[in-house]
């Protein structure tokens, strides 16, 4: 009996050993399979990235780069962003290969070790990229270490947050509209360009201006957006689908998702079958892998921190500084001056798309904390103002504190400029965007809350594009009497994309600043949504190349990002969810528009968030409808309350410093950093010269005496 018992124990032990050995072998085999798959994909993706870079450089060296190549210059991922996007692409392609080459039944098959896959790819865990100093009074450049409990929260090169689960054709990455016969909620999605043509476009520019908002109101929105989010495009994943095939032949595949032209589109005669469109960069999923759906990257910090001035990567931040000076200054242009005032330095990476715009002027693009700084001339103008203000602050702080070294001067000036952007945005800008909804969504500040998630949400990147409806068709330059400046005082918008030469060699920024103050934004109108300058001539700075359609790009990008439809977001915000023409008509207060939308989408559930949100009537005293007020208000409240370095958070500034900061204004920024001497007191409101303008001596100055240290 005892012998039998020992034999049973022995046999059981052998069986357990065999199972354990089998598991070990299977695990080793699984690890080897993962390693092999990742290795092959890395080779393929690295080649795609290198080929893309080489091709772009070659194209910009040619005499006739395309619209696509000009815009790609600004959307091209660099540095750590490039690495994060490349890892995301390797992760996704490796997963596809493992599904294809192994017995995996689906991507969530428990036999696949997702942690092992992530480490093999190089994704790692979401940990800070810098060492956190909990006692530092200054933000990190990357946005890491803001939240002490979760130091990577809000940092650059992380995924945009999802407030609702992503919606893709396959549940993972394929956008709706990719597969021709695939439906969404029982209906095929309309072509993005068709929606643009039938809903967004208009011909007559008469009566489109906003009688209550200055052009600066529009421009500040773009500044804030560029401070908060940026999703560069990814590269194509394989040699089968090159960018040439995407751009020239409209061949859909990998990350090429061309915007096809509908029948009778006028662009069919001049631009072939499509506008090329490359999908946004995305990052690796993170543990515990509850969702493997593609999540797009935010390449900049989620905080309102002037990252567009200083950068979101340490290497860039360092290049932007004048490290040879002990004054904490930002580097400025050494080749050109604006009547004694500084310009941003040129980005001397050759070739430059800005030089292509005027081949005889030889003026490159500017370098700034955000790569998009030279996309259009008014954006470059405000970048110039912010750069000058940093250096003005640093010099004044040095005068007050001669013993401060360059690093302290830089950090203190950076901190003040960050507070300036926060104050202007929340005190002056958001109240006239959200109108009567302001207090509902952004109540008075109650202090920092480390449980609030400050990350920019994916949907916000579409909600904030309401500003595209505010862009007028022309840009005006005005003289010191606010009269037309020079023989070409009013210029079509499309001639000012990538146009730095007009600043450097044709008048400086003062005439443009006066235009921002005295001219008006466009008013969003349900019948006149986006000017043709953006809808047909985007990134068409010369007659040699054909323009893009920003509205169609926005709609295609909604699908690229896996955005839930209009009604999902209405439900998220506690608003009604119309199901019929009558219901949609009641929400939009416009039967014709409601019918046009349903003729295209068939159901309100499928309406893309960008067009659905912008189609709503504006709230009282605001410039967005109820849905966008909810999405924007919620996001800005989280940006504020989840930021440990928010200017009002006790301990960030002293009480006297906070009192002083409350006097900042955009008008004073102009007075201190240009030769403009007459400004309005309320720069975002529509102003008529001379009635609404005052001398700069009547505008409060920022008193920096509270920054004088006691050692003095």
Swiss-Prot record:
Its cofactor is Ca(2+); heme b. The modification Phosphoserine is found at residue 315. The active site is at 226 (proton acceptor). Its EC number is 1.11.1.7. GO terms for cellular component: basolateral plasma membrane; cytoplasm; extracellular space. Heme-containing oxidoreductase which catalyzes the conversion of thiocyanate (SCN(-)) into antimicrobial agent hypothiocyanous acid (OSCN(-)) in the presence of hydrogen peroxide (H2O2). Also involved in the conversion of iodide (I(-)) into hypoiodite (IO(-)) in the presence of H2O2. Responsible for the inactivation of a wide range of micro-organisms and hence, important component of defense mechanism. This is Lactoperoxidase. It comes from Capra hircus (Goat).
